[in-house]
A protein has these predicted regions:
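A general alpha-helix detector
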Residues: 61-62, 109-113, 143-144, 160-163
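C-terminal regulatory/interaction module of P-loop NTP-utilizing enzymes
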Residues: 115-123
Length: 178
């Protein structure tokens, strides 16, 4: 496990690339760096991917697979098959973006948690309970989009927004970083 220091990661990945067969896929679990940044000085950069898992990995099967500008589609698919052979659920991230997908969603919630703490709305324990015993249970089997499709009835998420959108304006305006 290499610390999240760009130059250290690049140097380590370059060394790994120089000492392994060009048929070996090299992966990093980073969520802080873009694959294109990391594959910059590597030999055969087409074999580099980010395979970003979630902890604890024995409970959270998601692995986000992100390729850089030089990563081949074939190598992304090989990585996908490898992770799936271990029982992981893969998500092919369409483009490089800081934090990939799931961490970005998690960070949006984290910002709201920091606001709630800062505004003395709840304690850390109360905030965790509000997730663990509330939407966290639902999120374990339904994604946010599916929830709002169902909540909107026959009209789906569009109807939900039309019906409840005005009441959501205040919370949406509060989601800026504290």
């Amino acid at each position: 496990n290499i610390p999240e220091i760009l130059e250290l990661k690049r140097k380590s990945l370059k060394s790994i690339a120089e000492t392994t067969s060009n048929k070996i896929i090299i992966s990093s679990s980073t969520s802080g760096f873009m694959p294109t940044e990391l594959q910059k000085d590597m030999q055969f950069p087409e074999r580099f991917i980010v395979g970003h898992p979630f902890n604890p990995v024995y409970l959270c099967p998601l692995v986000e697979i992100v390729g850089g500008k030089e990563t081949s589609d074939n190598n992304k698919n090989i990585a996908k098959n490898f992770y799936e052979s271990m029982g992981m659920h893969t998500l092919m991230v369409r483009k490089e973006v800081p934090g990939h997908i799931a961490d970005r969603l998690q960070e949006a919630m984290w910002r709201e948690i920091l606001h709630a703490l800062n505004d003395d709305i709840a304690t850390t324990g109360e905030l965790d309970e509000s997730i663990v015993y509330g939407p966290g249970l639902r999120w374990s089997f339904m994604g946010m989009n599916q929830i709002y499709m169902i909540a909107g009835g026959k009209g789906g998420a569009r109807h939900f927004i039309e019906q409840f959108g005005p009441a959501l304006e205040w919370p949406w305006s509060h989601l800026k970083a504290p």
